[in-house]
Every structure is written in C-alpha cells, then in structure tokens.
Regions:
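Short, well-ordered coil/turn segments that N-cap beta-strands
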Residues: 1, 28-30, 62-68, 130-135, ...
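The substrate-binding groove and active-site-proximal loops of carbohydrate-active enzymes
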Residues: 3-12, 37-52, 99-118, 142-147, ...
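Conserved, mostly hydrophobic/aromatic
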Residues: 5, 24, 32, 61, ...
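Short, acidic/polar
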Residues: 11-26, 117-123, 239-248, 329-337, ...
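Aromatic-lined substrate-binding rim segments of carbohydrate-active enzymes
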Residues: 18-26, 33-95, 220-228, 483
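Polysaccharide-binding and catalytic clefts of secreted carbohydrate-active enzymes
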Residues: 94-296
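Carbohydrate-binding surfaces of carbohydrate-active enzymes
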Residues: 265, 279, 283-716, 721-724
C-alpha cells in the first residue's frame, strides 16, 4: 500500500527539500507525485529545457526509501506556447478562444500541441525513466475538462459523421432532421454545435469529445510506455465528473486507474446527515454530502477498469476556494482512507504536501499549512501511515466484496445534461442538467443506507453471456439508462430470464443509441420481462406519499419525488402505489418473476426513506442474509474485503460525534490490537472512528500471520495485459 502526497519543491517560498523529505520519512510516507504542473519550468523557452531541478528531489526521495510518480506537465501550457502558437488555444465556442490564465486551455488534439508535447515528454522521460525512485508515470492531469469548439475539431467531427453514417440522408433520418427544417443537403450544411437544439447531434458531439480525450490519453500513454522500463506503470489522474470524459473508456489505455476522491467534510461526512443529496455549504465540485458520496466515488474509481485503483488526490484538510474552509474533524481522514482501502485503493496520495502561498489554489489546504510547520493534519496522517505499516500483509491484495451492481452510462449522462427529465431550481426548457446524477444518487444512497456494497459497471463492460452476468451480479440496478442499444436491452432481459434480479427505474430504455425516443409502449423491449407498462409520466413537484399495495409484500414507505411513471401492471405484482387523487390509479413499484429471475420496476425517484426500504427488500428477496449489515446503529456502516489469504476483513465505521456500541454478529480479531472478540460483544466505536476486524483467517497459509508485520510498499507493475498494480 502506497501512501504519500503530491510534492512541489518548485512552489516552496524557500529551499527546504531535505526538511520536507525528512518530515515525510518520519511520517511513514512511501510515495510522492512530482512535476506535472510546470511546463514553463521544464521548458522556459521553446526548445530550451531545464531538467536538473527534479534530480535532487528524486535523489532525496530515494535516499529515504520514498518512491515517485512523475507527471508529464502537458495540462498547463506556458505563456510562450500560447503566444507563438495561438492556434492551439482551445475554443469554448466557435471562434471563441479560452483566455489564457487558467489551465487546461489547449486543444490537445491539435498537431502543433502534440508536436510540442511529444518533444517535452520524450525529453523528461528520457532523463528520468531510469531513476531508481521512479515507479510510474502520470500522463497529463484530469483530462476532459473542456469541450473543444475549434475549427479543426469540428471538421474532424464531420469526418467522423461521414464514416459513421455514410451519407447525409442517413444522418437526416437517424437524427430526425426534418424537424424545424434542419435537413442537410450536403455535409457542409451541418451547423456548428453552439446553437444546436437537436438531442442526437448533441449526443454525437459529446461522444466525439470523449473520443478526443481517449485518443489523446492513448497516444500519451503509448508514448511514455515506449520509453520506460517494464516495471514502471502508466496512469492518469481522472476527475470522475469531467464533461469530455467517459470514465470506462479512459481506463483502457492505462496500466492502472488513478482518480481524485474528494468529499464533503465536518458535518458533511455525517451519517445519517442531511436527507437531501447536495453539498450545501461544501465545495462547489462536491456533488452531495455524506459518506455515501465518498463510497460512490470509490466504486466509480474501481469501475474504471474493474480493478484496484490509485487515489491520485484526496482531501488533506480544507479543499476548494477561499470561502471553502472546512478542515476535517479529528478521525475523518482516517475514516476516509480506510473506506478507500476497503473498496480497492492501492495508493492514497494527498493533494498536496504544503498549502500554496500564491495562485488560484492558495486556500486548497495541504498537509502542511502556510506556516509550513507540522500540525494536526500531519500528525493524523502520520498515524494512518503507521496503521498501514502495522496492517502489513493483511491489506495487500484486498478484493472488495460487493452485494449488488449498478449500471452507469456516459451516454445517458450526456443526454440528460442536454435534455434532463427532472426540473431544477428554476424552470428550464431542457430541464435540470444534473438529472442523471440526481437519479443515480437517489438509488445509490438507498443501497448504501441499507448496508449494501456496490460494483459500478458500464454497458460496455457487461459480459455477453447472461449466465455469466447473473453469476457475477445477482442484483443489477439500472438507473436512468435513457440511451440504450437494442442489444443492451436484450441482454438485460436475458439476464433476468437467466436468474438475475433486474431493477429498472424511470427513463431506462426510453431512447435508442441516437437519443431518439422509441416508438413503442414503454418500457419497450423490457415490457414482457417487467410485466408492466406505462404510457404517461409526470414531473412531481411535491413529494407524494407511497402506499403499500401488496398485503403480503414488503412494507415499503417513503415518498415519490421529481418524477412518476404511470405504471400499469400486466402480470407483475404491485408492491406500492401513490397516495394521490390522480396518481393513485397507477402503480409506483412493481415486481415480476420472469424466467428464473425477477424484474422490479421503480417508477419514481425515491426519497431517502423509500430508497432505503426498497434496498432492504431487494436484499431480503435476492441476497443471502448478512447480520453485519442488518442490525446496525444508524451512524454505523460495515463493509468488507477478502484478503490475499482468504480471510474476511471488516471495516466498521461510526460516522458521527456520539460514541456508539455495535454488537458483533461473529467472532473476530482486532487487526491492530490482536485481541480476539467474541460474537455478541458490544464493540465500542468512538467519535468518527473505524475498527478493522479480521473474520475467519483460517485460510492463511501455514506460517503466515495476518498481523502487524511491516510490508514493503506495493509497486504497481504491468497493465492489462502487460502491467498490473
């Protein structure tokens, strides 16, 4: 397990390299990330490279047993590049170059940019690839932030459309361009995307932008991989919500996935916390608060490649702008770290070592504050590093255990950003661009509250065999799969037929792969499997109480929010309806045995109470009983992973100020104290506390102890098929 921080000696106000690295070594840090943000330092003038400045950093790290990930500094271009090559500036709209002064303002598909970037990368990698401290390379940083409107990008988009559709008549038909007199007679007739109102156009444009990002990272990774030794890995730093990015696609050219995991802190990390899934007073880029948001990001990061991942950046203390000052309460950093480990992280790296004294991120806090003196943050992280050393082999090669899977779709997210079904804070013709995230959050949060762990998977990652899908994913929740190919819907149907429990939600299957609404009674191809249909739907402005309809069924309770499909059962059992004079004629939730499996249709966006009760029922009807999740205080969560030795490692958290007792369902051993604790014992959890408990470690090889034996840092090696972490 690697543990460390991004380190920028070039940002320090005075020379303190030895002091910084000594502090890291004393804290037990094992890795740093360096060099990724300063093209103008590496190449202050075109063709003039200054490479020596990193040598003492890597040497000092190596002398202290600290490894390094070197970043290629291509995401923040120097002023001379913008001045001499203005054509490389990214356009935020047709003819509208992004003003210089931030970062990620270059079109990385432009040949001039690629030429300059390749020369830079070859020079840096050639100098440092053989340094003994270097274990891997981060190519670029947080790609996909921008949507490029450059002329050459638009022409490339036209070429892409020609290849895909062949002729304009096919495009006219597939996109429905008869509407509003948009029919093309020639490819030159296609208008720029700035004023576009056609959903099919926008979806194709967003897919093309994602393709540009993937092609760039593929090019970049191949370039570096061809220059470095076999035992060094290639990754990038994925910001999970970038608009020009499909996270499952970006993982393909990488050896190991790397992601940012940022989360709300202080009371924003409390459980139960707020019922509303939004960030409130927390940093603008944190979509909503509570530990469920933290776990969703962990699961998304693992879903990039369906493999363990690296946390490239996470909170050290306050994150965000000058008015986002929410340092973590004591214990919260430890809780967050162990949640990441439980869900597959093989490295935890903080952004960053020291708070900057200048620049846009002056108040994005580092491990050391502006005083550069160790304080509470440093002490708490050093204690975590000590726990890593103490845990030793027990946390090497952990395999997260999951109960259900959730299907997330980049296409559906993009389509709903353009034409969202839910209403936002103010009326808008095209709805709330956060509609997809709101629907996903509603269902994920219910699963989390019910104690269920989730695997995130994309449509492209589904196996073609429904039997294999059932074996790997006995319950599959499909939130808002608005864009779906016929083949995907058929696989979902066959999945249920083969024995899986398929959970459908509003908007699933409504449009085809071109974002064209299907001309069939919904849910279309899934109607026979669902045993229910609908022909009308409505936005819901005020929460509507859900009523139980099946006297022998689950006691579902809570409210319908935001949306309601007017479900009519035709063979399905109606589990719940609406307490409403109009909606009361429809079902809210149905379930239908189909083949060897089951399809449950949830026709609304559930509030937290309804989502939790629904998840409890799903677990009861489709999953083995698990006392670890079924009898917990409301502030406690329990997740688990299988160790390399076959034992089960339980991570028991208390996400609150008040201490709490958790009665253990089974015999365990405390990972850190070695104490054996019998089933039925009240485990004491302090404020913002986490306990690691080993259950059934009889599978450890003879002579092996799952105990405090120190272990060397894990060095990721080999992608698929060449390198793995």
């Amino acid at each position: 397990m690697l543990f460390g921080a991004a380190y920028y000696t070039e940002y320090q106000p005075y020379e303190r390299l030895a002091q910084d690295l000594d502090l890291m070594a004393e804290a037990g840090f094992s890795v740093i990330r360096v060099g990724e943000s300063v093209w103008s330092t590496w190449e202050p003038r075109e063709g003039h490279f200054e490479l020596d400045w990193l040598q003492p950093v890597l040497d000092a790290a190596h002398d202290r047993g600290i490894k390094a990930i070197v970043g290629t500094p291509t995401y923040a271009v120097p002023p001379w590049l913008r001045r001499k090559y203005p054509e490389t500036a990214a356009r935020s709209g047709t003819g509208q170059p992004i003003p210089y002064g931030m970062r990620q303002d270059a079109d990385y598909s432009h040949p001039a940019f690629r030429h300059l970037a390749e020369r830079l990368v070859r020079t840096i990698v050639g100098r440092y690839a053989d340094h003994p401290a270097v274990i891997g390379w981060q190519v670029d940083n947080e790609p996909g932030l921008r949507i490029f409107h450059n002329d050459a990008v638009f022409q490339g988009f036209l070429d892409h459309l020609r290849d895909r559709y062949g002729d304009v008549e096919t495009l006219n038909r597939r996109w429905g361009l008869t509407y509003w007199s948009h029919r093309l007679q020639d490819w030159a007739d296609l208008w720029p995307p700035d004023g576009n109102t056609t959903p099919s156009y926008d979806l194709a444009w967003r897919r093309y932008q994602s393709r540009l990002t993937q092609e760039y990272i593929t090019w970049h990774a191949a370039l570096v991989r061809g220059l470095v030794p076999e035992d060094q890995f290639v990754t990038t730093c994925v910001a999970l919500g970038q608009q020009g990015l499909d996270i499952s696609a970006i993982g393909r050219p990488l050896d190991v996935a790397g992601a940012n995991i940022y989360y709300a802190t202080q009371d924003g990390l409390a459980l139960p916390g707020s019922d509303e899934p939004d960030g409130g007073l927390y940093p603008f880029f944190v979509s909503w608060s509570g530990p469920a948001w933290l776990y969703l990001q962990n699961d998304m990061a693992r879903g990039i490649r369906q493999e363990p991942f690296l946390v490239m950046e996470t909170n050290a203390t306050s994150i965000g702008g000058s008015a986002d000052n929410f340092p973590l309460y004591k214990g919260q950093a430890r809780q967050a770290v162990w949640s990441m480990v439980a869900r597959g992280a093989r490295m935890i790296e903080y952004w960053h070592w020291h708070s900057l004294h200048y620049g846009a991120e002056t108040y994005w806090g580092g491990i050391l504050g502006h005083s550069l003196e160790p304080g509470r943050t440093y002490d708490e992280l050093a204690a975590i590093a000590g726990e890593f050393r103490q845990a030793g082999s027990a946390i090497e090669g952990l395999r997260p255990r999951s109960d259900v899977a959730m299907l997330l779709s980049a296409d559906s997210r993009w389509a709903m950003e353009f034409m969202g079904p839910l209403r936002g804070n103010s009326p808008a013709w095209f709805g709330d661009p956060q509609s997809y995230e709101r629907i996903v959050a509603a269902f994920y949060r219910g699963l989390f509250d019910a104690g269920l762990s989730v695997d995130i998977v994309s449509p492209e990652q589904l196996p073609s065999s429904p039997e294999e899908l059932v074996e790997r994913r006995p319950v599959l929740v499909v939130p808002a799969l608005y864009i779906a190919e016929d083949a995907t819907l058929d696989l979902l149907r066959r999945y249920a037929e083969a024995g899986g429990h398929l959970v459908l939600t509003p908007r699933t299957g409504y449009a085809d792969e071109e974002a064209v609404a299907r001309h069939t009674v919904m849910p279309g191809a899934l109607r026979p499997a669902a045993g229910a249909y609908y022909q009308e739907f409505t936005n819901v402005l005020t929460p509507v109480t859900i009523t139980q309809r099946d006297a022998n069924g689950p006691a579902l309770h809570g409210h319908a929010t935001a949306w309601a499909d007017g479900l009519i059962a035709e063979g399905a059992t109606v589990l719940a309806g609406y307490d409403h004079p109009h909606l009361g004629q429809f079902a809210a939730i149905t379930t239908h045995e189909y083949g060897s499996g089951r399809v449950t249709y949830v026709g609304t966006v559930p509030d937290r109470e309804l989502s939790r009760s629904l998840a409890d029922w799903l677990a009861g009807v489709s999953l083995p009983a698990d006392a670890w999740r079924e009898d917990r205080p409301p502030t406690v969560t329990c997740t688990s992973a299988t160790t390399a030795h076959g034992a089960v490692l339980r991570f028991v958290h208390n996400w609150a100020w008040d201490p709490v007792d958790y009665r253990l369902p089974g015999d365990v051993r405390d990972l850190f104290t070695g104490e054996s604790v019998a089933a039925g014992t009240a485990l004491e959890l302090g404020p913002w506390d986490v306990r690691l408990l080993v259950e059934d470690d009889t599978g450890a090889p003879s002579g092996t102890r799952i105990d405090p034996a120190p272990a060397a840092p894990i060095t990721p090696t080999s992608p698929s098929p060449r390198r793995t972490p």
